[in-house]
Structure formats: structure tokens, C-alpha cells
A protein has these predicted regions:
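Hydrophobic ligand-binding cavity/cleft-lining segments
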Residues: 1-44
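Short, intrinsically disordered, mixed-charge
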Residues: 24-37, 70, 122-133
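Short strand-connecting beta-turns/loops that link adjacent beta-strands
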Residues: 18, 56, 69, 94-98
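Hydrophobic pocket/interface hotspot
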Residues: 22-26, 32, 51, 64, ...
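Short, surface-exposed coil-to-beta transition loops
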Residues: 8-10, 57-61, 83-88
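Generic structural detector for well-ordered beta-strands
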Residues: 12-16, 63, 90-92
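Beta-strand/loop substructures that line and gate deep hydrophobic ligand-binding cavities in soluble
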Residues: 76-134
Length: 134
């Protein structure tokens, strides 16, 4: 690895759910608390920003960039003036059926990378469970 300490955590998981089912769960931001409670306790539509999320009583604008044809959904928020960051999620066709879901998260300076990795693994497992039940 070059460039010092890692700045992101990326994991993937295989599922029997088709790409369309995974993207359907991801494209509905109100479902984020079901599978990613570490990110948001609640997400609601906001006429100004599109979406507003709440975590531990703090509200933040959330931009959801979805490309259903490409199987991508990104959840973005302002991390510094003029800069966005967040979760970058891809669902691709798995040979033989189902899909492979990959998510990349930024590593926060005050959070142990092992904790981020464990949270991401739980989130992916819950996400694919929801997609399989769709």
C-alpha cells in the first residue's frame, strides 16, 4: 500500500438476491435505519435538500445518487465546506445468479478501523437479508 494509512474500508458480500432487489432497498433512503443504524436513526424526505437524516439527535442533509442501470447508490453528506463524502455502494451480477454487493466507507479519524470493518460487515449482511426478502 502506498500513501500512508488506509482512508477507506471496503467489503463485499454475495447474495442470491438479484441486483434489482438490492438496488430497490438501497434506492429507498427511508430504509437506511433498517440495515445501517450506525449511519442514521431516521431518514425523511426534505423539500430543500432531498433527504434529511438524523443520528443521535443530530440532523444532516443527505444526497442520494442512484443509477439503477449501473447498480450504484451513493449516500453523500457534506463532510467539509464544499466537500461530500459517504457510503459508495455497488451491486453487480454474480455469475450463476444473484449479485455481489460492494460498499466503501471512509475511515473516520476518531474511530477504530476494526470497528468500522465490523459495522460494515453487519450492515452488508442485513442489507442482503432485506433484499433477499423483497
Amino acid at each position: 500500500m502506498t500513501g500512508g494509512a488506509p482512508r477507506t474500508e471496503t467489503q463485499c458480500i454475495e447474495t442470491d438476491a438479484p441486483v434489482e432487489a438490492v438496488v430497490a432497498v438501497l434506492a429507498d433512503p427511508t430504509r437506511i435505519p433498517q440495515w445501517a443504524p450506525a449511519f442514521a436513526d431516521q431518514v425523511r424526505s426534505d423539500p430543500k435538500s432531498g433527504w434529511e437524516a438524523t443520528k443521535d439527535g443530530r440532523e444532516f442533509a443527505l444526497r442520494v445518487a442512484t443509477n439503477e442501470d449501473a447498480g450504484t447508490v451513493d449516500y453523500l453528506r457534506q463532510v467539509a465546506p464544499g466537500r461530500e463524502g459517504g457510503a459508495y455502494i455497488r451491486a453487480v451480477l454474480r455469475p450463476g445468479g444473484g449479485s455481489v454487493v460492494t460498499m466503501t466507507l471512509p475511515l473516520l479519524p476518531d474511530v477504530d478501523p476494526a470497528d468500522t470493518a465490523a459495522t460494515l460487515a453487519r450492515e452488508l449482511a442485513t442489507l442482503t437479508s432485506l433484499a433477499e426478502g423483497s
